UniProtKB/Swiss-Prot annotation:
Cell wall formation. It comes from Methylorubrum extorquens (strain PA1). Pathway: Cell wall biogenesis; peptidoglycan biosynthesis. This is D-alanine--D-alanine ligase. Belongs to the D-alanine--D-alanine ligase family. Its cofactor is Mg(2+); Mn(2+). Mg(2+) 2 binds at E268, N270.
Length: 307
């Protein structure tokens, strides 16, 4: 009898629609691989749903708070349902950008300088010397990210308004100029490096990530061999330092601008990267010779407890 897999998707975070795309793509691929699949649109009754469903494994296609911060992982541990991706601790650590940086820095991974500040204080005066970036402590998909270019710019006033829905504390980081890179990690190996070039704008914001034609993916990234290998080393080290399991994706910046610093830094590790057939991790896996179906099958067969 084929293995029964519950594909968890949706949820109630700001990344719900992205999660639905990932989940449906994974479910379709798993069905093509011969698994018995139940699509689960996650809501507040998820504990009851999973208790009644009793799948052999859960493929976690959730994004954002409650889906990749250790919450759903803890529930799956309680229910004794093997699941994909990272466990409770690694998920919670990686989701909290500042604590993740502390762990990565201790492991020798270069990260941007920065500090946590109250959002109202950051709206009154510059928390760092511009250029700098302000971002929510625990959001994905570039939600709420603001770049302040120079000292003549006013601090971002939206931080003090009711429109800001990402919590009272924000992370202010030194802006690193240069190229946007990302590296997929699968288990104990780095699969490859992609350079992301936004078609409009200067950085990889939400629209560049998810709008059709919003960015160009250069795979493999056109880098000197030593830099390419260093990106892979940093991604794998960050994955291991945070205790990640299964699939993760490290996002980096490389400053090779004229007169630049040459800095190569890890911005964050995504423990629940996008999983449509055109998402970054599946693209990198395909370039490494692994089809989308083979990728999701590997993830399900890797599912376990105590991750």
């Amino acid at each position: 009898m084929s293995k029964h897999v519950a594909v968890l998707m949706g949820g109630w975070s700001s990344e719900r629609e992205i999660s639905l795309r990932s989940g449906n793509a994974c479910a379709e691929a798993l069905e093509g691989e011969g698994y018995r699949v139940t699509r689960v649109n996650v809501g507040p009754d998820i504990a009851t749903v999973l208790t009644e469903l009793r799948p052999d494994a859960a493929l976690n296609a959730l994004h954002g708070p409650a889906g990749e911060d250790g919450t759903i992982q803890g529930l799956l541990e309680i229910l004794k349902i093997p699941y994909t991706h990272s466990g409770v601790l690694a998920s919670a650590l990686a989701m909290h950008k500042e604590r993740a940086k502390t762990v990565m820095r201790a492991a020798g991974v270069s990260v941007p300088e920065g500090r946590v500040v109250n959002r109202h204080d950051a709206a009154k005066s510059h928390p760092l010397t511009p250029p700098y970036v302000v971002k929510p402590i625990a959001e994905g998909s570039s939600m709420g990210v603001i770049i302040v270019r120079d000292e003549r710019s006013h601090p971002p006033q939206i931080l003090a308004s009711d429109e800001w829905v990402y919590g009272e504390e924000v992370l202010a980081e030194t802006y690193v100029a240069g190229r946007e890179l990302t590296c997929a990690v699968l288990g104990d190996r780095a699969l490859g490096v992609t350079e992301i070039k936004p078609v409009s704008g200067e950085w990889y914001d939400f629209d560049a990530k998810y709008a059709g034609g919003g960015s160009i993916h250069v795979l493999p990234a056109d880098l000197k061999l030593n830099i390419y290998q260093r990106v892979q080393e940093l991604a794998l080290t960050a994955h291991q330092a945070l205790g990640c399991r299964g699939v993760s994706r490290a996002d980096l910046r490389y400053d090779d601008t004229p007169g630049g610093t040459g800095a190569l830094v890890v911005l964050e590790v995504n423990t629940q990267p996008g999983m449509t057939q055109t998402s970054l991790v599946p693209e990198i896996a395909a370039h490494a010779g692994q089809s989308f179906g083979e990728l999701v099958r590997w993830m399900v067969e890797d599912a376990s407890l105590n991750r």
